[in-house]
């Protein structure tokens, strides 16, 4: 799709109108935060994070690279600049001004690169409301996937095919997994 200057000018005006005070060129420069990631060892993990992406990590079971994380189970360390050596979780607590108008007590992102050499388990992720009430006040787990590489004929499981709660229960209790699970 071709963009023309008129379209770009329109969208620039719209962005500035809606959030201009936070995007103005007159704001003081804020450095880009480069981070040292957190790695996890998982039974389904592999070696691609080291062999194909150049991370210097040991083990043949590296499942996840947490590239942006301020999570209780692992937080990135700032790699350089004014905050070098500081944990992202500490920066979030002590310097909220660096993160714009983000609301909430919990750092809202967990960005991962996953190397799954074996099938992953099917998981059910809560929304924010359920997680706040039942998961010690944490955020829900909304996901977005960007697949860097996969084997031919790979599939993703996204949701299920049950139309009602009763149908879901019936499919689970009777082991009708191939009918229940939605693969793409």
Give the residues covered by each predicted segment.
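Conserved, mostly hydrophobic/aromatic
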Residues: 1, 12
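C-terminal beta-signal and terminal closure region of outer-membrane beta-barrel proteins
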Residues: 4-5
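Catalytic-face loop-and-helix region of soluble metabolic enzyme cores
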Residues: 14-21
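Residues that form generic nucleotide/phosphate-binding pockets
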Residues: 15, 91, 95, 171, ...
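Transition-metal
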Residues: 24-159, 163
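Active-site glycine-rich loop that binds ribose-phosphate moieties when present
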Residues: 164-184
